[in-house]
């Protein structure tokens, strides 16, 4: 899969209907956006949030897609784009006193990660974007 914004090759992975709320998953995704895949996986390994496990799986899957489908070097991969969309909401009821029932919304997420292969110059996409904005 080629990205029209950059000349660098990209690979994508998506996890749909993950049983974690989008707000909590976005906190985890914000930790790793713009970092190398190796750094991102190390950060997520020790992150205390429950959403770090599915996000790490998606990043590892995107890296595997880049390595197997596009023959890219895993050491040059950077998490270029990562975002979380809201999935379907499972609606459940919590019984309450006197015949009442409260609704429980079990939210799901769609986690998307796009990894990009950068030349071995050592600059990350985060540094490049900051320089171009000025």
Curated annotation (Swiss-Prot):
CDD domains: Ribosomal_L22 (cd00336). InterPro entries: Ribosomal_uL22, Ribosomal_uL22_bac/chlpt-type, Ribosomal_uL22_bac/org-type, Ribosomal_uL22_CS, Ribosomal_uL22_sf. One of its GO terms (molecular function) is rRNA binding. Keywords: Ribonucleoprotein, Ribosomal protein, RNA-binding, rRNA-binding. It holds the Pfam family Ribosomal_L22. HAMAP family: Ribosomal_uL22_B. This is Large ribosomal subunit protein uL22. It comes from Rhodococcus opacus (strain B4). The gene is rplV.
